[in-house]
Swiss-Prot record:
Gene: pheT
Subcellular location: Plastid, Chloroplast
GO molecular function: ATP binding; magnesium ion binding; phenylalanine-tRNA ligase activity; RNA binding
Name of the protein in question: Phenylalanine--tRNA ligase beta subunit, chloroplastic
A single Gene Ontology CC term: chloroplast
Stored InterPro entries: aa-tRNA-synth_II/BPL/LPL (IPR045864), B3/B4_tRNA-bd (IPR005146), DNA-bd_dom_put_sf (IPR009061), Fdx_antiC-bd (IPR005121), Fdx_antiC-bd_sf (IPR036690), Phe-tRNA-ligase_IIc_bsu (IPR045060), Phe-tRNA-ligase_IIc_bsu_bact (IPR004532), Phe-tRNA_synthase-like_B3/B4 (IPR020825)
Amino acid sequence: MKFSLRWLQQIVDLNNIKFSTLVDKLSVSGFEVEDISRNSSNDDMIFDVTTTANRQDILCTVGLAREISSIFNRDLKYKLYKDSIAISTHCLNILNSVSLLDLSIVNVNYFYNNRSPLWLQYYLSSYNIKSLNLLTDIPQYIYLKWGQSIEIFDKNKISSVPIQYSLFNLQKKSHIIYDSPNIELEVLRYDDVILFPIGFSLNENIKCDAATNSIVIMGYVCDKQYITDIKKKLKLSTYLSQRCCNQGSRSDFLNAFYESVYLLGSFGFATLGKFYGYHKLYNISRILFIDKVKIQNILGSVKIGSYNYLTVKEIFTLLERLNFLPIYDSLKSSFKIHIPVYRQDDIVRPIDVIEEVARIYGFDNFISKLPLNPIDNKNIFLNNIFANKVYRIRYLLRCLGLHEAQNYSFYDYYPFNHDTQIKIYNPLAQDQSFLRSSLAVHLTLNQQDNLRQGNKDIEVFEIGKVFRLYSSSLEYDNTLNSFEFLHLSGLIANSIFLRPSWSDKEQSLSWFHAKGMVEEFLDRLEVPVVWKKISDLDQSNLFFNLMHLLNMNWTAIICNRFHEEIGIFGKLCNKSDFNSTYVFEFDLVKLIASIESLNHINSIINPYSSYPSLTRDISLTVKNSCTISFIKARILSYENNLIESIEVFNYYKDKSINAFYNVGLRIVYRAHNRTLNYSDINRIDQEIDDLLNEYKL
């Protein structure tokens, strides 16, 4: 819809408002401004405004002026543009129309069909409409200004005698438009003369001509739903039906009709007759109740001044600018809002009112962050902490040289056919048959794709959701419950990881090198862990589904300091060890929960002992099932508080004795307040003798 800036300035106060500011504000408020052109001869700007389907009230000059008045908090220049005028009308003999909401008729006699005044000619020319005469120009002017339909008929062609308003009536009739026998349209008649089928066409035989000196002015508002239904039945759309569907607000009808009669009577030097009309009752005024807290929580804090919410006074003022009728209940801290008639099509829910408040106040004046509910503050705070931890994990892995991968959560098949996989019934595609239970499987597929492209070395990680069934749930025949988890997984393969010297050939990544990278990642993340050897992944609650993917001789379970399983690290089952591939996978939630940030407040400061220490190196031959941790715990079980440290300095295995291995331990003894005496040394030697005898072959 095109608009004239000069015309708008005569309706709403736009002094000291630049046109560029007007365009920006309208665009931010949801009304896109396009096709701006300047008419230098008349010092005017013509621009096109597009709006949404639920804001038909904007598609006329008064409607846009009313919206600009709310946006800029400027007054409309005449009360006529705010409120409907009160006209003394007589009732027409029309009852229960299905097509009409309003109908007004007035007879005008002794009319002179003069040329339109220059100001009217200019306004029409702004819309590329050629001015002809008053009878043609004024209905077009009224439609552009108010969005209301006005029709003018030659009174003498309707009746040669004075108009009797009781003869106006509505009748349902078929065969009116293009021979439609099964479709009845409501037709406005005067006695036996058909004036027009409501909303579709006009009787050409009663139109005005050059000899017209007595006219019938008719204004009407159609039921848009009726017009839409008839258009669908007829499969036909006419120029008049389109205008009726795009008609402006019903509340502006009387103002538009009064102005059209006034202009025709004034410039045509005519005598006006009495006003007759038919008006359906308006729907009950819509009332919405909105809590003040709801408005503040949804909109959030404002940028201007201190970071506070909109006050009750500010909200009240904004609602009044929108021509709403607000009432604030201080006891309930809520607003009771009466919605004006011309906004009842698009203001239906409380959220619509809140959006209007934000639009008028300015979306850019609010802080761009999620609203905080006092009940959920703690959860939102925890979510932010979790997100920050995930960001740090990504950062640390990138620093170690790993690239992030993204895969979707489906398999086209599961290579190991494990019972704990979740199968999709009736999948949309073949490659969406299973939900993934591990990130590592997709990373191995990524590696295979890279190998086919000639990329031997790949170091990637992925963070995503996995879906699996607990192995314990398989014992039941009832419906199995699926579970969703957030995991972190990585894959490392590097054939040129290091070389001892420049003259040596490159060496591939070893198990210990890969383990060192994982340890460095955990150290930087500040997660204390314990590495545990595992012989069968059925013992694992988290990673039992990787049993066929990893080499059990090169696989370790990673636990936190409470010995809870949080991750796994191992070597893939490759046929060749030339370029070994290693993977790790963590339960991300448990990994983050295991982070123990270093805090100097929690540190215990002790001075170094100035007394000499005693060192004992021992060599033990133990069974393969006996771990180093168990041996250390056995030494500490002697409850000797002089033990300062226990370190492994050697490890070897005799191939002739497969069931045992040898380990060298260095135990350091020291007292913090004295020098060790003979009694201390004798106790230490006795404990070592007992230990050697215990692990003696």
